[in-house]
A protein has these predicted regions:
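Metal-dependent phosphohydrolase cores
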Residues: 1-162
Length: 162
């Protein structure tokens, strides 16, 4: 069976989030909007705020269209949350999962690729330093997922006391 769901059949919460999220991207600083997340072919790329927005919007679509009410209820119950709180958690996790792509090590990793090195130049042109500290230079690889986890952990500790 094929789906006949069209663009205009999207649940209203998905549409509302997409509209708010576009404004959120536009409100980010020049520096934040200079960070790249998906290099693509170098012409068609996504900035970090755009990628985080797209991730949240995709999660919203999955939450509202694909997950059944019984699955949402079961997950929410197991976590001690309401379904609305579960939705907020899912969207937050989706939107924050790649924050580690903003670290210097990640931003510099494509600098030697001629087709996309201009993305690194955009970061510097926005006034951000990409000079890596001793700790970063002594690490051969720093997966952005590990950096994301550290950023989220530190933020939760500083702002929420977790």
């Amino acid at each position: 069976m094929t789906s006949t769901r069209g663009l205009w059949d999207l649940p209203q919460p998905v549409i509302d989030l997409a509209q708010r999220a576009n404004g959120w991207v536009a409100e980010r600083s020049v520096e934040a909007r200079s960070l790249w997340a998906k290099s693509g072919d170098g012409v068609n790329f996504l900035t970090l705020p755009e990628h985080l927005r797209d991730s949240a919007c995709a999660a919203s679509l999955v939450f509202h269209v694909w997950l059944s009410d019984s699955i949402k209820g079961g997950l929410a119950g197991n976590l001690g949350l309401s379904v609305k709180e579960l939705e907020k958690l899912v969207l937050w996790l989706s939107a924050s999962h790649d924050l580690g792509k903003g670290v210097r090590k990640f931003q510099c990793q494509i600098e030697l690729r001629e087709d996309v090195r201009h993305l690194v130049s955009r970061v510097r042109d926005a006034g951000l330093s990409l000079d890596q500290g001793v700790d970063e230079l002594n690490v051969d690889k720093l997966p952005h997922s590990v950096a994301s986890g550290g950023i989220i952990r530190d933020w939760l500790e500083e702002t929420r006391g977790f």
